[in-house]
Amino acid sequence: MNLFPAIDLRDGKVVRLTQGDYDRMTVYGEDPCAQAWQFVEAGARYLHVVDLDGAKDGTLSNYRSIAALAKQGGLYIEVGGGIRTEERIEKYLSLGVDRCILGSVAVTDFDFTARMLKRYGERIAVGVDAKDGFVAIHGWKEVSAEKGVDFCRRLADAGCTAIIYTDIAYDGAMQGTNLALYRQLATEVPGVAFTASGGISSEAELLELKKMGTAAAILGKSLYTGALDLKRCVELVQN
């Protein structure tokens, strides 16, 4: 199982939100590259980057920070947040970003998403964020009428091979993750590499996720608060 430490960007700063709430934001650093280097020194080979300004407003205000992270080297980098056009995908891939994550647009424009999956293959992942089991969009501000598991099936049928699934209720809450959900996804949507995201706060959870065949896990607040030690986690579960 691969581990993706997370860097969430707001106004160029490293931050974490609680349950996707922009009013419940904690700033953990002013320098994303310095934070990424700390992750590398702990043994990380992957990095999950979210442009929170992009997710909320569609802006490119964190573009320089993302460019600097991509230029740093030594990490497989996936980026999400506000990617709603092919132009934005090309922009990030040309920087050296390894994979772009489509979020809200996968719900609002499924045909576009299917085309991008066909055109770019494994360089596209889809982020599915669910609130009470239903897909949430636009920075988690709106909830759709479609169940997350059903949406994952549709994505798989469209050729999606990688889905980052977040249960919003668990995200940033430091109360554990929804293991039953990831077990269900592995069983009901075979053939998709799922990344678990939201609330992972113990080594036991990581081991359980690996055991059930989860492809990757994103670690956020648990690293910033010191609840988990990245070096030990990498040694424990990373391929």
Task: Specify the residue positions occupied by each region the protein language model found.
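Conserved anion-binding
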Residues: 11-12, 19-23, 90, 97-171
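Conserved, mostly hydrophobic/aromatic
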Residues: 8, 39, 47, 92, ...
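Glycine-rich phosphate-binding active-site loops on the catalytic face of alpha/beta enzymes
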Residues: 83, 94-112, 167-170, 198-202, ...
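Catalytic cores of alpha/beta
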Residues: 73, 77-98, 180-216
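Conserved beta-strand positions in the central sheet of alpha/beta enzyme cores
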Residues: 48-51, 78, 101-102, 125, ...
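Charged helix-capping and loop-helix junction motifs
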Residues: 60-67, 141-150, 175-184
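Glycine-rich, proline-tolerant flexible connector loops at the mouths of alpha/beta enzymes
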Residues: 46-64, 104, 165-175
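Glycine/small-residue-rich loop that forms an oxyanion/phosphate-binding "nest" at active or ligand-binding sites
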Residues: 53, 61-118
